[in-house]
Swiss-Prot record:
The keyword DNA repair does not apply. It catalyses: tRNA(Leu) + L-leucine + ATP = L-leucyl-tRNA(Leu) + AMP + diphosphate. A motif ('KMSKS' region) lies at residues 581-585. Its EC number is 6.1.1.4. Gene3D superfamilies: 3.10.20.590, HUPs, Isoleucyl-tRNA Synthetase, Domain 1. Signal peptide: none annotated. GO terms for molecular function: aminoacyl-tRNA deacylase activity; ATP binding; leucine-tRNA ligase activity. It is found in: Cytoplasm. It comes from the Bacteria. Belongs to the class-I aminoacyl-tRNA synthetase family. This is Leucine--tRNA ligase. NCBIfam families: leuS_bact. GO terms for cellular component: cytosol.
């Protein structure tokens, strides 16, 4: 027999699958459907690394298995191709971004096809295609019409080098994640999406979906819903109130100072009264260099200034309390002001110690000698006037009643979640389909005029004042108002990369439809997505944004379900062989092209699934790759053992055990243990002189989702009918997964003396008869009387003698 040569085999089968559209999703909507989705990649210039195929292979395995179980499987792929890295590369190398994107996509697709994924390539999408982003723009217009898109001046993280705004997550230690430059705070007029209107539903509807618990927790924590009250503190010097949000209204008697954000409007409104205004403005300039994450870091030293000229009045004690400005209070959370209770909050305690501010404990048992007393969910109130002696819960309710009765506050639900900044001052993104008219204000384009196509420009760099390159194209900017026909100007900001990825799963259901996002018939049949797998790094922003868009589309009658994904799982990273994250700078990146060339795509697929627990990170090991290649070499050689007349019964129990374990493990993401079971079965095959065609056929079907090329090739060589992918998935008989013959331990007076082979259902007399024939057991029974026999069926047999 010729040697296993994956290079020729794999090209042959990939060509067959492509030419025959083997994995094209059927239009037959009478079949039960299975929609499997993996996050579509950003097509970078570096191409795929070995981390990419891990999730793709995982859901490819599930998809191939489900096809053999009779499902109509939708398993698509596309490209999340807008984004800053492409634009920066285009600027640096003087190449058009669309050319860069096209080349990168070609490379990514070539790599994916070389690994043998069963994607339906007829449904391929690209977020930079005008036929695609026409519908991204359409969704934005619907949001605008419903009041969910609005423009607002707000402070943002600004990178002077990249000349663009950055999300908090893109700022590392005060520097831009992309270029390393110093980030500053800058006020910009930005388009916002009102995701906060959906905050409660985004939390409450998680009960209806099957997500990993840690994914649900991340979503809930990111939204940060908290119940409390807004309370007004009067300002002594002027007719003004400072409003705070607090979850602990019961502790207000312990509020000994207030802190407002450096951006709080009161500072400039009363700048003429603030004696140290220059000092505060200088401090604000320093704070502008920090990200919000840095400003709220609990471990950093507390900084700030007392505002000389504004004093607050505690509405419960009527005492005057100082007002400070500090970086740890954010204008974008709550009201931009806090009442500080230093006896019971770590940050307030550190701040109060530094500025020598009074501390008043209000919970019984508080020891604040060395630190704040923060175990305050239980206990009774002290130093709190009419709340004294009440429990924490009783005191909260009493205080809510009091502030509403006295009209100094009210109960309120608050969220950490902020509205979504939706503008980017860059070129390579979807144009925002709005124009500004002096008479009509902001007006959306007519739907018949979509898509608003991104115009070609000679220079992709943002302007020095931070405007998009589109602002320099006069014939793009100047237009007519769609409403009144007068002169108007277009919005020149573009959408963020998140836009196209917030609804792409819907387009896969009907990717060539030019009348709608997708037909109602297709959306009703294919959605929601049955199983979505992606990285843990995307379980907050991307998952939250797409759930928000989906809920909006549900509200306007476009989609049939409240949630986009019924199941969400995540995978661990593949690390370098030194246990560090793969990166060019560390020199530990492994290119899948090299593995496919040297070992074969099936070896790569097998190793990626055998490397360890799918949900956990695992280091790459070339020895592990070689081990999987040896396994496939052994699979190849096992053809020689097949004899059509061999006895099937000899291996029947192990075969049924393997069908059961592999079937369950594939669905439970336990690919490593499924492959280990297949290795066990293969070893047992090789311990026999011959195996039956039926046994080997079952083995090939079970292995096919992991290693589709070698199994199809052997299948054809063995003369089995049709193709593996057309076969029915084998079913197991539960009764046949249990061994009829077992090894039973035999004890004499509680001590193990032997084991005997016995039928699992053997009676006590049958076991005894077999046991006494064992030479060792017989020796311990000589000249003894058997007084008792203890038989735990299928477990142990104990003979008591005297």
């Amino acid at each position: 027999m010729d040697k296993y040569n994956p290079n020729s085999i794999e090209k042959k089968w990939q060509k067959y699958w492509e030419e025959n559209k083997t994995f094209k999703t059927s239009d037959d909507k009478s079949k039960k459907r299975f929609y499997a989705l993996v996050e579509f990649p950003y097509p970078s210039g570096q191409g795929l690394h070995v981390g990419h195929p891990r999730p793709y292979t995982a859901l490819d395995i599930v998809s191939r298995k489900r096809r053999m179980q009779g499902y109509n499987v939708l398993y698509p792929m596309g490209w999340d191709a807008f984004g800053l890295p492409t634009e920066n590369f285009a600027i640096k190398n003087k190449i058009r971004p669309e050319v860069v994107t096209e080349n990168n996509i070609k490379n990514f697709k070539r790599q994916m096809q070389s690994i043998g994924f069963s994607f339906d390539w007829d449904r391929e999408i690209n977020t930079t295609d005008p036929d695609y982003y026409k519908w991204t723009q359409w969704i934005f217009i619907q949001m605008f019409k419903k009041g969910l898109a609005y423009k607002k001046e707000m402070p943002i993280n600004w990178c002077p080098s990249c000349k663009t705004g950055l999300a908090n997550e893109e700022v590392i230690n005060g520097h831009c994640e992309r270029c390393g430059g110093q980030v500053v705070r800058k006020v910009k007029n930005q388009w916002m999406l009102k995701i906060t209107e959906y905050a409660d539903r985004l939390i409450d509807d998680l009960k209806d979906v099957d997500y990993f618990d840690r994914i649900k927790s991340q979503q809930i924590n990111w939204i940060g819903r908290s119940y409390g009250a807004e309370i007004n503190f009067a300002v002594k010097e002027v007719d003004e109130k400072i409003t705070v949000f607090t979850t602990r209204a019961d502790t207000i008697f312990g509020a000994t100072y207030m802190v407002i954000s450096v951006d709080h409007p009161l500072i400039e409104k009363y700048s003429d009264r603030i004696k140290n205004i220059d000092e505060i403005r200088s401090y604000r300039s320093e704070v502008a260099k920090k990200s919000e994450l840095e400003r709220t870091d609990l471990s950093k030293e507390k900084t700030g200034y007392k505002i000389d000229g504004l004093t607050a009045i505690n509405p419960l004690t009527n005492k005057e309390i100082p007002v400070y400005v500090s970086d740890y209070v954010l204008m974008t959370y709550g009201t931009g002001a806090i009442m500080a209770v230093p006896a019971h909050d770590d940050r307030d305690y550190e701040f109060a110690k530094k500025f020598n501010i009074e501390m008043i404990p209000v919970i019984e048992g508080s020891d604040i000698q060395n630190c704040a007393f923060t175990e305050t969910n239980e206990g009774n109130l002290i130093n709190s006037g009419f709340l004294n002696g009440l429990t924490v819960d009783e005191a909260k309710e009493k205080m809510y009643e009091y502030i509403e009765e006295k009209e100094i506050g009210h109960k309120k639900t608050n969220y950490k979640l902020r509205d979504w900044v939706f503008s980017r001052q860059r070129y390579w993104g979807e144009p925002i389909p709005l124009v500004y008219c002096e008479h009509c204000g902001w007006v959306p384009l007519d739907e018949k005029d979509l898509p608003l196509v991104l115009p070609k420009v000679d220079n992709y760099e943002p302007t020095d004042n931070g405007e998009s390159p589109l602002s320099k194209i006069d014939d793009f900017v100047h237009t007519k108002c769609p409403k009144c026909g007068r002169d108007a100007v277009r919005e020149t900001d573009t959408m963020p990369q998140w836009a196209g990825s917030s609804w792409y799963y819907l387009r896969y259901t009907d990717p060539h439809n030019d009348e709608a996002i997708a037909s109602k018939e297709n959306l009703d049949y294919y959605t929601p997505v049955d199983w979505y797998n992606g990285g843990m790094e995307h379980t907050t922003l991307h998952l939250l944004y797409s759930r928000f868009w989906h809920k909006f589309l549900y509200d306007i009658g476009v989609v049939p379900t409240k949630e986009p994904y019924m199941k969400r799982t995540s995978h661990g990273m593949i690390l370098g062989d030194n246990n560090e994250k793969m990166s060019k700078s560390r020199g530990n990146v492994v290119n899948p092209d090299d593995i496919v060339r040297d070992f074969g795509a099936d070896t790569l697929r097998c190793y990626e699934m055998f490397i360890g627990d799918f949900e956990k990170s695992a280091p790459w090991s070339e020895n592990g790759v070689k081990g999987c290649r040896k396994f496939l070499d052994k699979v190849w050689r096992t053809q020689d053992l097949v004899d059509g007349d061999s006895n099937f019964e000899k291996m029947e129990t192990l075969i049924h055990q393997t069908i059961k374990k592999v079937s369950e493990d594939y669905e439970n993401l336990k690919f490593n243990t499924a492959i280990a079971q297949l290795m066990t079965l293969l070893n047992e095959f090789n311990n026999l002189d011959k195996i039956s065609k039926e046994q080997f056929k079952i083995f090939l079907i079970l292995l096919n989702p992991v290693c589709p090329h070698i199994t199809e090739e052997i299948w054809q060589r063995m003369g089995y009918e049709g193709y593996v992918h057309e076969s029915s998935w084998p079913e197991y008989d539960e009764s046949k997964t249990i061994l009829d013959v077992i090894e039973l331990p035999i004890q004499v007076n509680g001590k193990l003396r032997a084991t005997v082979e016995i039928n699992r259902e053997a009676s006590e007399d049958e076991v005894y008869e077999k046991a006494v024939k064992d030479d060792v057991v017989a020796k311990y029974l000589e000249n003894k009387n058997v007084v008792k026999k203890i038989y735990v069926k299928g477990r142990i047999f104990n003979i008591i003698v005297k």
